[in-house]
Regions:
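Acidic, metal/ion-coordinating pockets
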Residues: 17-291
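Sec-dependent N-terminal signal peptides of Gram-positive bacterial secreted proteins and lipoproteins
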Residues: 1-22
Length: 291
């Protein structure tokens, strides 16, 4: 009987993306996780996990990273954290700003759309998992989502993207990342879309927080992964404490057997805690990583 130990190895609280170096084993299934140790008899494996918060690109950041020829370079934003994200076995970022490219027109608060160079910087910084379900995911419409996903698939296919999907078939695919023989299953959800509504028949494009869906997703993921990590876009902006809904959802996820919960959206740091599930399991909850 395999024993699984989950230990928080390194959590970064930064504004921006990151890149990586070295080889990281990836599979068509996908998953991610914090410094995780799995033990089966004398078999001990260490996997390091680094996570950062909301990568939200405001207008001033566009301005200061413009090259003057219509292109952008955001890589220097992450140069001081690359040593962490590139070294980690799995590095996670919440890509809050949708990056549908300049062809859709760049925009910032309150409705965002960024250039593809943001995604290049994320890749250069070494991220393996990009959460792409937030209240800003539909800011550039359906085309913004499709453009971002197409760019990631063509230029950065090794980065796992959760929470948004180009097709119904893709929305049903399980994502698992394998490191040191340990399979990390990953999921991501958002509380809403800032009043924007997905077209009828396209509801699959963004994973919204829905208990029935989450339960079904987690149950399927547990069959093909050793560790389950869920990204949750939730909470109250600029509040340093989790609200009751966050706590209730954390308990719900723990009861399902989820191992790690990564929270975003408040734009400030909130506490970390362990929640005990109904079967006595312990779930590490990071309520908010800030920006």
């Amino acid at each position: 009987m395999k024993k699984l130990w989950i230990v928080l190895g390194c959590v970064l609280l930064v504004t921006g993306c990151s890149g990586k170096s070295g080889t990281k084993e990836t599979k068509q299934e996908k998953a991610a996780d914090p410094v995780v140790k799995t033990e089966e008899k004398d078999d001990i494996r260490d996997v390091s996990f680094v996570a950062v918060g909301d990568n939200l690109i405001h207008g001033a950041i566009f301005y200061y990273n413009a090259k003057g020829d219509g292109t952008y370079d955001f890589k220097d934003i992450y140069e001081h954290t690359n040593r962490y994200t590139r070294k980690a076995d799995i590095a996670y970022i919440n890509q809050e700003t949708i990056c549908g490219g300049t062809e859709l027109g760049l925009s910032h608060y309150p409705s965002f759309n960024g250039p593809y160079e943001v995604l290049d910087a994320v890749a250069d910084a070494g991220f393996d998992w990009m959460a792409a379900s937030s209240n800003h995911t539909l800011d550039a419409g359906v085309q913004g989502i499709l453009n971002q996903l197409a760019y990631m698939k063509e230029h950065h296919p090794d980065i796992r993207v959760t929470g948004s999907h180009a097709t119904r078939e893709e929305s049903e695919q399980l994502q698992v990342i394998t490191r040191e023989g340990v399979k990390f299953g990953i999921l991501g959800y958002t509380y809403g879309l800032n009043g924007y509504v997905l077209p009828k028949g396209k509801e699959y494009m963004v994973d919204l927080i829905d208990k029935d869906k989450i339960k079904n997703d987690v149950e399927k993921l547990k069959k093909v992964s050793d560790v389950q990590i869920v990204s949750m876009h939730w909470g109250t902006e600029y509040s340093f404490e989790p609200n009751e809904e966050q706590k209730e959802l954390a308990q719900f996820l723990s009861d399902l057997g989820v191992d790690v919960i990564i929270g975003e959206h408040p734009h400030v740091i909130q506490p970390m805690d362990y929640v005990t599930g109904k079967d006595g399991n312990q779930t590490l909850v990071i309520y908010s990583l800030g920006n």
